[in-house]
């Protein structure tokens, strides 16, 4: 059995990875979950906390991808340097040869400029140490590894971290049925936060696709921990895993769930199959029968209440559909909002400035957001 001395500190530093542009609101969420010394950095947030906090963040965070536990920074001038440095670490403290392994590598320097090659050096150093000691070694598993190690190359050093999460938290596990170019769940939650939506406000997505905005809103409204849908977390394979603590956090989360939404949620889309997918996704996450779904073309939508928040993610020509064909549709979005949704606040998320100009309404706020490498903007319209 690995010894647990590497995990013995009461509180320790962690790093949560997050989409670029979402660092500040992720830092706010982590603070609300109990993190201390919270510091937004590039594409992530550094913080400190105890084991209970680590578990709680994996269970409850709606915005981050994963939580890394930094374990060592070693010399990495070139491949030989990195191999020697990695092999000096006592890997017995972290896992045993019976456990499966995956190495994820980011960053580069002039000598280590290919992430797959760098990951191979890290893996070779670890399994060679195991073979020298035990005549057996951890197998690599790229699908469902027990242990995931993150190696980040910066200048002539490599920062090594244990990944506590495993499957990225944006893959909630509730969404087997996808529409075209779906939003990541973490991004949908972040956009709802930016929009100032809270569970007591009615919400309508007239271009709902597979339902991501509404599913994330529903989970918030019912106080359901998004992490409960994950198949498992890597920290459960760590030598210091506290089963009783984890069970207690799960029980507390379950006890705090609500049965009814605090305000109505509506979703419509012109594609019947997509609406069926959204209903199926809702069923997977305790939201079956709680959200109003309707097959409806955008031109035919009407406000389902006197006031509320409307949010949508129309196609913007980069991935689905061609830009030229979308200009008229964006103009229609503006016309429908202006003529029918007085008293509402609308948000349109798009990655195409030329198209959003066709909406023809004055924005009251703009929030820049990165979506899978595409610079996008969340546009706010106060409809009077």
UniProtKB/Swiss-Prot annotation:
Keywords, sorted A to Z: Methyltransferase, Transferase
Example of a GO MF term: RNA binding
Entries under Pfam families matching the protein: RlmL_1st, THUMP, UPF0020
GO biological process: tRNA methylation
Domain named THUMP: residues: 53-164
Enzyme type, top EC level: transferase
EC number in record: 2.1.1.-
Protein family membership: Belongs to the methyltransferase superfamily.
Protein name: Putative RNA methyltransferase slr0064
Organism (species): Synechocystis sp. (strain ATCC 27184 / PCC 6803 / Kazusa)
């Amino acid at each position: 059995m690995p010894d647990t001395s590497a995990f013995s500190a009461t509180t320790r530093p962690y790093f949560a990875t997050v989409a670029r542009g979402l660092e500040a609101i992720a830092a706010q969420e982590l603070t609300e979950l109990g993190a201390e010394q919270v510091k937004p950095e590039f594409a992530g947030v550094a913080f400190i906390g105890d084991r209970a906090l680590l578990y709680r963040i994996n269970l409850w965070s709606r915005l981050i991808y994963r939580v890394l536990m930094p374990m060592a920074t070693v010399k990495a001038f070139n491949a030989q340097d990195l191999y020697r440095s990695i092999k000096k670490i006592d890997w017995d403290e972290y896992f045993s040869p019976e456990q499966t392994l995956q190495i994820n590598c980011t960053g580069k320097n002039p000598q280590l400029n290919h992430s797959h090659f760098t990951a191979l050096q890290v893996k070779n150093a670890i399994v060679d140490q195991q073979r020298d000691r035990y005549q057996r070694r951890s197998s690599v598993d790229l699908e469902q590894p027990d242990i995931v190690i993150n190696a980040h190359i910066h200048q002539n050093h490599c920062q090594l971290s244990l990944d506590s999460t495993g499957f990225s938290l944006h893959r909630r596990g509730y969404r087997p049925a996808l529409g075209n170019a779906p939003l990541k769940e973490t991004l949908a939650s972040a956009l709802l936060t930016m929009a100032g939506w809270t569970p007591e406000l009615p919400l309508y997505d007239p271009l709902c696709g597979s339902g991501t905005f509404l599913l994330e809103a529903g989970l918030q409204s019912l106080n359901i921990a998004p992490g409960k849908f994950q198949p498992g977390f890597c920290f459960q394979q760590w030598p210091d895993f506290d089963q009783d603590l984890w069970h207690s956090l799960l029980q507390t989360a379950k006890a705090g769930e609500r049965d009814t939404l605090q305000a109505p949620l509506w979703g419509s889309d012109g594609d019947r199959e997509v609406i069926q997918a959204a209903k199926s996704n809702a069923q997977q996450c305790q939201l079956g029968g709680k959200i109003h779904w309707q097959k409806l073309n955008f031109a035919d939508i009407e406000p389902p209440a006197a006031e509320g928040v409307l949010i949508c993610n129309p196609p913007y020509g980069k991935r689905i559909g061609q830009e030229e064909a979308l200009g008229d549709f964006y103009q229609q979005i503006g016309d429908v909002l202006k003529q029918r949704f007085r008293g509402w606040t609308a948000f349109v998320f798009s990655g195409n400035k030329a198209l959003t100009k066709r909406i023809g309404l004055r924005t009251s706020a703009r929030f820049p957001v990165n979506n899978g490498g595409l610079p996008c903007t969340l546009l706010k319209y106060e409809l009077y």
